[in-house]
Amino acid sequence: MNRKVIKPVVLSGLFLAALIVFSIITNQDNKDMTTAMKEATLPIVQFYEENNSVAQLHGYVSEMNITKMRDGIVPVDHTRLLPLKINTYGQKIRGIAYEIRSLDDSRLVAKGNAQEIKEKNNEISANLKIQNILGKGEEYELIVILASGKNKIRYYTRLMQTQNDDTQACMDFALQFHEYTFRDDANKFIPKYMDAATGDTSTLNYVDLSCTLNQITWADLKPEQMGELEASFKEINDSYDVITLRYVVTTKGTGGETEYYNVEEYYRLRMTESRMYVLNFERTLNQIFRGENRFITDNNQIQLGIRDKNIEYTVSETGDVIAFVQQGELWCFDRVNNKIVQVFSFLGAEGINARDNWNQHDIKIARVDEAGSIDFVVYGYMNRGDHEGEVGTAVYHYDGLVHTIEEEIFIPSDVSYEILKAQMGQLMYVNEKGTFYLIMDQKLYSIDTDKRTPEVLVKDLKESCYKVSESNQYFAWVDSDKEYKSDVIHLMNLKNASVYDIKAKKGAYILPLGFIDEDFIYGAAKKDKVMVAAAGNTVFPMKNLTIMDTSENSHSILKTYKPSRGSIGSISVEDYTITIHLIKKSGGHYVAAGTDAIMNREGDTEEKVTVGSTVTDRKETQYQLMMKNGADASKIKMLTSKSVLLENPRDVSVKNKESQEYFYVYKKGDVLFATDEIADAIVCANNHMGVVVDSKQQYVWMRARKSAQTAFSSLKVNDADKSSSSVVQAVSAMLNYRGNGLSVKELIDNGGTPKSAIENTLKDSVVLDISGCTVEEILFYVSKGSPVFAMTGTDSAVLVTGYTSGSIYYYDPQTHSTRSKSYKDADDWFRKAGYIFFTYLDR
């Protein structure tokens, strides 16, 4: 062979061998550092009443704060025997123990081990035999503890020994009602429980008893239930039981593809000797987005399907990349590159199951760039993955070029998702420098995601003293020690941590009121008009409000509003409308004086992507993300992100101890609202048929109360207070009734108020300022044996001491007699005095 031919062949062979060796060495140093999310491993515990599952519990890998773990409640009958089943999913269980504690976690009531344990095919059945020490009708916390290897897995629920068989009857009824919604003969059963058809007849997302029978029975959707039904008691009391049912249904799409929906039914039921009353029935239906299904509509929009209109989404500057959240999943659509990415999801590739699909987490999007990269926050219970069985807040970065997500920090928490959402949902923001901002324990924190060190920026936050913009980029506050008497508002742009001070004009105080979109709203009141009323509450009558532009730090004034009548008491903002609640002075105090409104007519005209809706015969209302630039539905690629493997944990410790009393409004096990203002919580709970609990899980308000309360007797004014005003005498009679015969006049002469006099005297009780409530709402406290102090004029007051179905009883301290008024007359009487009420509850 010619040497000139051999030489190139040899050289080529040597080069190829060297290339192979180099590739091997390089690959050894550059292993794939990404992985799919780990599958769920923790067992599920179920409790049964008769043959019905009444609780499905998910496990926690660390001890939780019992006072912040309030979801379902398990009824125990007179046998005090609790049957349970454990789906182990192959997890080896070596022991089953339990503890029963008081709701405030101040005492251990009982503990023991499960008995009659049997195991078969990854399922364990056992019984908890509860000692005869539970007070009937009293709530406790039950913790089931599974020993698995060296670890303990805890399961939390409330527990109550019921006084009758109503709970079983209510559960049976709820399951029967549920079954009839799928049946062709539903008209034989459901109509007798329906209200007049006055509800929205154009949606299947939300259905209640005021909708049509056609909607309650799914209209033309024809869904099929998939998998097990998850039933749970949420409230059990003498007046009603609350039950929820969760399940998944499937339907066929227009192209024959399978569509999945999460469904929740809510029942508030009252059982009497004669019949069952359906006080409330609600059903929500929410579509689970599937990227593999056709989701681009004929007019090139992203079809999200049947769901509510409040969509969490963010778009890139050009509008070509859209990130959105649906049913606990984060998706990203890249219009230019024609791809859809499942960025974050607990749902596995093998289908929908009870562990992956548990709805106790949420996602907040911080930002999206043109490359499709996203900063986002996942908070709540972690269904699977590295933090399975933990509750916490994780900050992630998704790289749109290589389709990986990397955890930047994880803040573990010992409270339930519902409490975490209420606490942290107020503000979560990640800026481009990698600084994460959040509010926890009435403090504004910043956390550098590289250094992972928390810093307190503002502390002692009160709800009335700060506001957050819709995007969470802007935070406005006044110092808490200057509530209602501040001449400066601090406005922080969290994008760059800059602070701009807004200063009041001479002779005025200013207060942050809110944001419309990203524009800041604040109000001003004359210093000499801000007053502390006779009852001790502060009135801040604003002479005007100002809307300030925050874009590009311009801080220009967009609008100043002055009411044509009265003063501004407060505002509320919805979409692009500011509703102004006016007040006026009447007889020395302020009362409501109607409303006014300011509309932002520009609205969302400059938005690259907006929310739209369509109505069809089969699915009724569906929602879409409307893009100004269309998308090609023919060649969309679907991708799933992978997680970057971490060498070390990225946990950040942030102390979460409530420094002030908080009130939580619960409905169907969900926290609707959390606030430090009890009156606001009561109004919310009343409007939504909910309950209010405090930071120790103690009920502080519910709609359920006795049908009548005899007027309290033995009310008398302390001798030292008999010559004082009726305000002083009313407080004196309240304290005397409680067994504290102090001179109220002396307390008030020394600078006190009726409110402070009650607080400083009844130290073993919870004193509540329930000003702003109606007569109907304050009667809960009377039914609990507590008189309610009520202002009737500038310097006059009475005590509400009883009620019937049509009237209230009140003690008049000036005549030392008990009188009555109809609800209507009493409500009008108290409304003209400003709805000023105080009361107390024994701890």
Residue ranges, per PLM feature:
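N-terminal Sec-pathway targeting helices
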Residues: 1-16
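Surface-exposed, charged secondary-structure patches
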Residues: 13, 17, 21, 25-31, ...
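Core segments of small alpha/beta cavity-forming domains
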Residues: 36-99, 103-108, 142-220, 296-339, ...
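Beta-propeller fold detector
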Residues: 110-113, 281, 340-349, 404-413, ...
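A short hydrophobic beta-strand element
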Residues: 140, 235-249, 372-378, 520-525, ...
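Exposed beta-sheet edge and beta->alpha loop/turn motif
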Residues: 240-278, 282, 812-814, 820
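Short loop/turn segments that connect beta-strands within beta-propeller blades
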Residues: 335-338, 399-401, 448-452, 493-497, ...
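Conserved active-site-adjacent core of cysteine acyl-enzyme catalytic domains
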Residues: 710-843
